[in-house]
């Protein structure tokens, strides 16, 4: 099928390959990298783009601009945006002859990797492990050891899957379940219903799941409650808690980190309550017995340290707990109730050359089982998801991610080092595109690493960039300088909420309790699971000398098929502002208490007070009015509630940390509240989170006074 040509007012502004189209085959010998892998030479031959992935995903659009169209990067992207935003991601193949030389020294460029456990990135698996860990912590506090594995009718079962199945057919608050309910539960678990399987399933529920869920249900705290230490009487009933007077709470002695002592009114009460809980949840028979539903194998302790001083083994805050000699660990209520937060561990230091050899050896050894078969993109993708799903196999890989070009230098030529190289000022050079004409990021006061200054990424086979949207819902452009295929998955921006609902359905505990989970860049979800839940997913295979563009609010993720070197940066054409992505991105981050990287108000103010060729007055006016009216409304509200000193504070912007609200993390560009007792500040909406000092010590700092804001309303 031939490429489709789209027309607007000018001839053929874009060439576009449909999802059913294929790219032209690569020249002979260009499907894999050459043998001289340690050299600076690159294989930039065009590779064949698959028409479908192993998941049956359709390929996203691929564009082939001619030399004239390719002259203006932002202009060209603006033209194809109406098509690209329907897919979330697209690929752009430069015209023949465009091939900037990579500037990195393979033997001198050094970096540190991140370690990635393929299992732990998978959202479903992490939900299972998180539940298992929380149950384990609960029973640790009771001095009880858990079996390492559980069985029903010789079928291995994890407590999380059994809990979810019970919860879908009954209530976890019910201690005794009807026989017909157990029949449905076992049927859903594909376990034959017998008297033995009924007893084994019921025993697992009563021994492990019900006690833990009952504890969580009774002592679950709201999201807004603050856990300062575990000395708070978490084991009190509501009535018992109400009997402690305010005076008692204030005068009771607190934990002293120097002496490691915690005494006072709460200590004896909590110790008694711990003993009550042990009696309440301790079964009459031996918990670690070698019965028919579990192995009598001690569960590996999650910490090698002992806990003679009763500090939480996870957060290291004090915890009062009667811990038996058989189990030295103890955990505070917060670390039992809430899922732990997952993150990548740091890996080793490498040069590019050394890492390439390491990656090539790994890939060669791993795929040696395929003997003489060609290692295609399909094979690598299948193996990746097989490894993620296989509970009996654990594989760790390494990834050189988020390597700032401010520190290491870009792989593109730069004007500073290569002033006569034409690629140094090319609009597709990632050092240029963020601040080129047409990108609103040129109106940001200071460079932002990873946003206006590119980052480098060095991949190995199976290394992963997890599902995420770009900071502040901006566009991104990713260029591959060298190496093996980088597989991309993308979702249209208008399906972001559908994606979030799918994630909630897959892992409700994690998503509910970690509001910013999908913004942590540490979560993978199989495209099959997303498609089952009505999410449209597209894919692209990226090779050397190819660009991938992601669109605002588009969740995307991907897998490296081997050693490769990529570079990425963000940019923001005017439609990013005019279509509401700038403001909505800031509001979304504020709701998650997640720090943004850009200030929407600063951008709008700078555009309004400086001539901007990128955007007209009529286009900008609604956004100026929105920002000004919102700020004036906040000032009216604050002045009505509090009697604060006010000063004009023009230096507000010099240090980003000093104008970021310490509660909601949003940039408070026009005004902020400070106190003489500390250096931190908050936005006017969150003055109550600043400190407990008298209002006379607090000041409302204004970067822009009311009169100047009022003048902007006539913009």
Swiss-Prot record:
Residues 422-588 form the JmjC domain. It comes from Schizosaccharomyces pombe (strain 972 / ATCC 24843). This is Jumonji/ARID domain-containing protein 2. Residues 125-217 form the ARID domain. GO terms for molecular function: DNA binding; histone H3K36 demethylase activity; histone H3K4 demethylase activity; histone H3K4me/H3K4me2/H3K4me3 demethylase activity; zinc ion binding. Fe cation binds at residues 468, 470, 556. Residues 21-53, 247-271 are annotated as: Disordered. GO terms for cellular component: chromatin; nucleus.
């Amino acid at each position: 099928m031939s490429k489709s040509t789209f027309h607007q007012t000018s001839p053929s502004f874009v060439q576009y390959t449909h999802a059913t189209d294929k790219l032209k085959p690569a020249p002979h010998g260009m499907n894999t990298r050459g043998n001289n892998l340690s050299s600076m030479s690159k294989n930039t031959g065009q590779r064949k783009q698959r028409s479908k992935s192993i998941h049956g995903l359709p390929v996203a659009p691929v564009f082939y601009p001619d030399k004239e169209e390719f002259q203006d990067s932002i202009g060209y992207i603006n033209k194809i945006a109406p098509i690209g935003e329907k897919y979330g991601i697209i690929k752009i193949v430069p015209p023949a002859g465009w091939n900037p030389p990579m500037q990195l020294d393979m033997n001198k460029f050094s970096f540190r990797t991140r370690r990635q456990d393929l299992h732990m990135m998978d959202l479903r698996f992490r939900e299972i492990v998180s539940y298992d860990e929380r149950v384990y912590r609960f029973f640790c506090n009771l001095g009880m050891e858990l079996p390492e594995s559980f069985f029903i009718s010789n079928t291995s079962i994890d407590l999380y899957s059994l809990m979810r199945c019970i919860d879908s057919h009954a209530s976890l608050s019910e201690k005794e379940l009807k026989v017909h309910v157990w029949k449905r539960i076992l049927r859903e678990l594909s376990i034959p219903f017998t008297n033995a399987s009924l007893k084994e399933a019921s025993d697992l529920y009563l021994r492990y799941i019900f006690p833990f869920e009952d504890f969580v249900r009774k002592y679950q705290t709201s999201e807004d409650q603050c856990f300062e230490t575990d000395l708070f009487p978490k084991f009190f009933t509501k009535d018992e808690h109400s009997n402690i007077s305010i005076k008692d709470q204030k005068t009771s002695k607190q934990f002293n980190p120097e002496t490691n002592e915690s005494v006072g009114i709460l200590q004896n009460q909590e110790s008694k309550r711990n003993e009550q809980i042990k009696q309440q949840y301790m079964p009459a028979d031996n918990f670690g017995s070698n019965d028919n539903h579990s192995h009598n194998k001690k569960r590996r302790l999650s910490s090698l340290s002992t806990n003679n001083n009763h500090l939480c083994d996870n957060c290291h805050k004090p915890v009062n707990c009667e811990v038996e000699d058989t189990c030295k660990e103890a955990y505070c209520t917060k670390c039992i109730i809430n899922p732990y937060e997952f993150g990548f561990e740091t890996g080793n230091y490498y040069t590019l050359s050394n890492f390439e050899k390491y990656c090539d050896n790994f890939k060669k050894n791993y795929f040696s089982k395929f003997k003489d078969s060609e290692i295609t993109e399909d094979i690598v993708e299948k193996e990746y998801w097989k490894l993620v799903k296989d509970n009996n196999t654990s594989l760790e890989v390494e990834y050189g991610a988020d390597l700032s070009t401010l520190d290491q230098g870009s792989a593109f030529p730069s004007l500073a080092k290569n002033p006569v190289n034409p690629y140094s000022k090319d609009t597709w050079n990632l050092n240029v595109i963020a601040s080129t004409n047409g990108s609103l990021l040129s109106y940001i006061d200071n460079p932002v690493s990873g946003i206006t200054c590119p980052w480098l990424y060095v991949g190995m086979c199976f290394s992963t960039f997890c599902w995420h949207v770009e900071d502040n819902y901006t566009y991104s452009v990713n260029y591959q300088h060298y190496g093996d295929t980088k597989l991309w998955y993308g979702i249209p921006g208008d399906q972001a909420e559908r994606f979030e609902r799918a994630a909630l359905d897959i892992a409700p505990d994690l998503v509910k309790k970690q509001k910013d989970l999908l913004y942590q860049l540490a979560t993978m979800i199989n495209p099959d699971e997303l498609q089952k839940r009505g999410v449209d997913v597209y894919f692209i295979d990226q090779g050397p000398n190819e660009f991938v563009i992601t669109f605002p609010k588009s969740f995307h993720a991907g897998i490296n098929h081997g050693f490769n070197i990529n570079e990425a940066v963000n940019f923001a054409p005017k439609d990013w502002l005019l279509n509401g992505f700038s403001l909505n991105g800031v509001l979304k981050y504020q709701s998650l208490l997640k720090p943004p990287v850009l200030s929407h108000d600063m951008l709008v103010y700078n555009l309004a007070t400086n001539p901007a060729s990128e955007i007209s007055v009529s286009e900008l006016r609604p956004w100026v009015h929105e920002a000004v009216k919102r700020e004036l409304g906040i000032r009216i509200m604050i002045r009505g509630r509090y009697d604060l000193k006010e000063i004009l504070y023009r230096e507000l912007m010099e240090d980003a940390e000093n104008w970021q609200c310490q509660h909601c993390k949003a940039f408070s560009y026009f005004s902020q509240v400070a106190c003489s007792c500390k250096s931190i500040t908050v936005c006017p909406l969150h003055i109550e989170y600043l400190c407990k000092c008298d209002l006379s010590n607090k000041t409302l700092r204004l970067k822009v006074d009311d009169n100047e804001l009022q003048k902007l309303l006539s913009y």
